[in-house]
């Protein structure tokens, strides 16, 4: 299988990431040393799997050991013996007074990225419960975060590193829906799934509030395919799980998984 064979399964804007993973694998082969990736979202991990399996590369994922959405991957020579410390993975716990404050995923991520001055891939999952939140981070950032962050929004917070064994379990249910859509265009799918007007759908997309497979998309005419994950700020996330074909009226019958946070 060549890279061209892999390209056909992904969007053109993902080709650069395909090349990045291919170059990392080549580096490991040339140097006989291992390399650890930054945090990868599920779409990026799917691409990584495709590239590494094509090359016959050996790899380990933190997702084999921790139930998380974002994972880190070790690409290694065949003789490499896994050391969990090589994932460079740390768990930070955030304590705050839930009686007077309410922390959200967005508030936490915005504050941490501001303090770190880095891109999103340095942070993994952010889990929020009443009075407590957790965030997975690259280990090199642990001390800086713990000693620098004292406020998130208006809330006073206390950060501390805790063992990975204390990782919270994500609380999320899946609601399965079957819907009929006139088109696989992004704007029309949002109208169908979210039960909003075409005007509202267009405004959300053009305001950069819609992501497809974790990447912001501002084209209302973006064509969706089976397996795409769509997230809409303020509305949640859903996956086009299966395209069940056309109805007698030549409309698309789709099976959708809608994520519901408890």
Annotate each PLM feature.
Residues 1-187, 193, 216, 237-262:
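Ferredoxin-like alpha/beta domains used as RNA- or RNAP-binding modules
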Residues 177-226:
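A basic, amphipathic helix-loop patch mediating RNA/tRNA/ribosome contacts
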Residues 228-229, 238:
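Short histidine
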């Amino acid at each position: 299988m060549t890279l061209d064979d892999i390209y056909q399964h992904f969007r053109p804007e993902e080709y650069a990431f395909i090349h990045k993973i291919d170059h990392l694998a080549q580096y490991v082969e040339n140097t006989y040393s291992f390399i650890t990736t930054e945090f990868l979202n599920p779409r990026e991990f799917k691409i990584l799997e495709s590239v590494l399996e094509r090359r016959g590369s050996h790899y380990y994922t933190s997702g084999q050991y921790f139930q998380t959405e974002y994972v880190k991957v070790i690409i290694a020579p065949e003789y490499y013996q896994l050391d969990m410390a090589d994932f460079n993975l740390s768990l930070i716990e955030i304590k705050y007074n839930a009686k007077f404050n309410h922390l959200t995923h967005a508030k936490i991520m915005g504050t941490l990225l501001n303090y770190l001055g880095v891109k999103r891939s340095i942070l993994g999952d952010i889990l929020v419960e009443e009075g407590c939140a957790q965030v997975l981070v690259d280990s090199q950032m642990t001390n800086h975060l713990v000693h620098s962050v004292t406020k998130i929004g208006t809330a006073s917070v206390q950060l501390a590193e805790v063992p990975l064994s204390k990782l919270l379990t994500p609380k999320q249910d899946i609601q399965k829906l079957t819907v009929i859509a006139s088109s696989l265009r992004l704007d029309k799918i949002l109208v169908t799934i979210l039960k909003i007007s075409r005007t509202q759908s267009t405004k959300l997309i053009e305001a950069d509030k819609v992501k497809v497979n974790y990447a912001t998309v501002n084209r209302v005419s973006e064509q969706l395919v089976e397996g795409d994950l769509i997230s809409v700020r303020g509305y949640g996330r859903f996956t086009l799980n299966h395209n069940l074909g056309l109805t007698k009226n030549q409309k698309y019958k789709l099976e959708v998984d809608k994520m519901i946070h408890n």
